[in-house]
């Protein structure tokens, strides 16, 4: 980094720890814990766990992106930004925006849609089984085919869930690219 943009050692450590911590958390929640919990817990228990976990997860992601953006934005002369510095600021702003959309808008709607789905499923005696454990025809498919209200609720849930997943993947990618850029700047190990 150039003169005037030299981060002190402590600020560099905070930046690296917050960025790597956020990315590690995002990788774990996105690619490990969700799949393990989905395969191991009854459907409605999984939903309950996710409804408690995700608000914290998205708010922590939002806070980490905000801290990193503030650190970098305060350390650079805006008129003299290099391509990489401008890219890193853009990526962190993107991560902050996507995490905020997830935390403040998508997560509450996804969770509300999930509760509505679970209400209908409980009325039909569904939701207590671990995915893949039932034999015979899929009772959820049968419910979708017979109940247009349930089918509409399911579409609504998957719309919000899909948008939330895309935002989350955007955060993972943005933070991963920032980390890759930092790693490429390391002169020795």
UniProtKB/Swiss-Prot annotation:
Tissue-specific expression: Widely expressed with highest levels in pancreas, followed by adrenal gland, thyroid, liver, mammary gland, prostate, kidney, and retina; lowest levels in skeletal muscle. Overexpressed in cisplatin-resistant cancer cells (at protein level).
Query: What Pfam families does the record point to?
Result: DUF4149
Q: How does it sit in the membrane?
A: Multi-pass membrane protein
User: Transmembrane segments in this chain: where?
Assistant: 18-38, 53-73, 81-101, 166-186
Q: Where in the cell is it found?
A: Membrane
Q: Which GO terms describe its cellular component?
A: membrane
Which keywords does UniProt give here? Membrane, Transmembrane, Transmembrane helix
Q: Does the keyword Cytoplasm apply?
A: no
Which cysteine pairs are covalently linked by disulfides here? none
Family, per entry:
Belongs to the TMEM205 family.
Protein's job: In cancer cells, plays a role in resistance to the chemotherapeutic agent cisplatin.
What is the name of the protein in this document?
A: Transmembrane protein 205
Which gene is transcribed and translated to give this protein?
TMEM205
